Amino acid sequence: MKKVVLAFSGGLDTSFCVKYLKDDKGMEVHSVLVDTGGFTDEEVADIEKKAYDLGVKTHYTARVADKYYKDCIRFLIFGNVLKNNTYPLSVSAERIFQAVAVAEYAKSIGATAIAHGSTGAGNDQVRFDMAFRIIVPDAEIITPIRDLKLSREAEIEYLKGKGVQREWHKSTYSINQGLWGTSVGGKETLNSWDYLPEEAYPTQLTKKKPSEITLEFIKGELKAVNNRRFKNPVEAIRRVHALAAPYAIGRDTHVGDTIIGIKGRVGFEAPAPLIIIKSHHLLEKHVLTKWQQYWKQNLAEWYGMLLHEGHFNEPVLRDIEAYFEHSQNTVTGTVRVRLAPYNFQVLGIQSDYDLMSDVFGSYGEMNNAWSGDDVRGFSKIASNQVMIHQKIQELAEKKK
């Protein structure tokens, strides 16, 4: 009997896959849930029960939140990565780690086939296929939902015919909650004009009085929130979320180019990622040189694009990560942030590495490290080439 590992979430599509692979294809199904930090213990237990009720041979939960942070999220912070200057790659980064974990599990148990429940309409199918082909290249990739092109109603009828009686209620909005943000999809995101209403977002406004928090970074990593230290950065991220989410902070709509070549739109709420990235970015403005910031921003654009499009295993990402890590040697300090309903403001920083030091001068006020003559000479040299260019153009025009 062929052994197949299935990426399993407990939803309609992956539940269909279990019965289809087991009953129709005669395969031994081993389901895998990958928890990147977005599930509660109760949800994990419920998904495991659903898997066994459907008839899987074994079910495995891969807990990869710490690995997800260490191998991905911290580099998204180091690079201040926001896709199209908006989206913190909440789902795209998570999906890649889910795909990698499923593939690694399939390899560990010697499975000859590997399956996922993605449709043929989005990015996830590519991310899963790529990870599977790279990590378990000899395994057959099976994609029942994509290949059979079944409607939701057809899947429900199939499962009913197999004796699976569950309430397959389709929510008005598709919610994907994760450690690095939550995506929100609905009819409004299927066109270019409408916007998600208040009730679409899973976190509602419950706090209205503004407050201030502090975030302490050491070599680019968040280590303390409001002077409370965290050994595990994942818990620090969750703490920022707990403080900011009641203000309904971090909502936006991402518009981008999908891997399959069409434009796509998705809403999201990501209070912790946006606050952490913007705070980290302000600290970097104070402690990095102009050219460090310039080149890091350029590399971050490429890093985010490659990661979003499923190229996590591309070696150049390791090269960019090495640059990011080296750039964080002086990114140490405390950032002050104001929280208010629907918005936040990064107020200021304190750092021993702050290059905005009054020892050398205050912008527009006083110079302590140079004289007027120094500036006069510098300005002459700095403008020399363009002055020569201008003169040559004038002489050439006179010869006409």
For each feature predicted by the language model, list its residue ranges.
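Nucleotide-activated chemistry modules centered on ATP-dependent adenylation/adenylyltransferase
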Residues: M1-K400
